[in-house]
Amino acid sequence: MSEESAAVLAALGRRGWTLGIAESLTGGALCADVVAIPGASAVLLGGVVAYATPVKATVLGVDVALLAAHGPVHPQVALQMADGVRDVVGVGGAPADVGVSTTGIAGPDSPDGQPVGTVHIGVVTPVASRTTAFHFSGDRDAIRAQAVAAALREVLAAVAE
């Protein structure tokens, strides 16, 4: 468990906001880090691992034309994933207040020519939407770990807005 996850849960809890997580390259690691914190269930509604490109469209509602034109590693894809997961994990007809997403290339190869370590993180809150691009280095595990930490920092920054 991480201090970043504890800080995210505390910040969301202070606002009375809930969280949904959509992951691609992190493969559930972000959600696992969050649920390692006792009391996470007061904030986290759920998560989706949309690893395959078609799942981003069918489950999270990412635009098929966007995926066809730009592939799964794109800032707009990250934004649509973050927005889509809010509805997917919503309870009682109400979406999660905050959605966060990770999409990128952990390596060792790049299927679409973008550099290994390219990561886009999307965050959608009731007051703002944002994506941030990162270029991490290291092996597959290091890139995934850096993406998890960056996603948590991005949620904290967005919640502070």
Model-derived features: positions:
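Short alpha-helical segments enriched in small residues
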Residues: 1-161
